[in-house]
């Protein structure tokens, strides 16, 4: 991913270009006879979630994305679960430079059943799902099937998701810096 328009778009969402370039791909596609480009995020079956400022969609097949950083025993490890790739990228931005556990990006809560075998293989599941009814139901289902489940959504209330939280945090930080930079008097 090197397209400056797409990197700028992700920048408006709080995602640094180094993270975007490492985790995403650039996708060119044709729709109704016109060419477009978008940010692509690969799933485990070769499909893509695609986003640009004007479009949100997918290239089949739809599936989850499993990002494995850990080479040890999964039973002794945690896995983080995200609803969409923008929340996953937001987590990486918030934890920049720190070690990250294994992650599962559902790419839609409808894909939760596809993730359950993987989630059950970990000792702990930390959920970073949306603060809405679908997110709550997904956490409940994970809780029914997995041993230790932690719902992290309360940490970014009142925001709908981790990306909204990140964007607000950046906006607040910029506002604070602007106030500090004003002359006294």
Predicted regions: what they are:
Residues 1-39, 179-185:
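TOPRIM metal-binding catalytic domain and adjacent DNA-binding surface shared by DnaG-type primases
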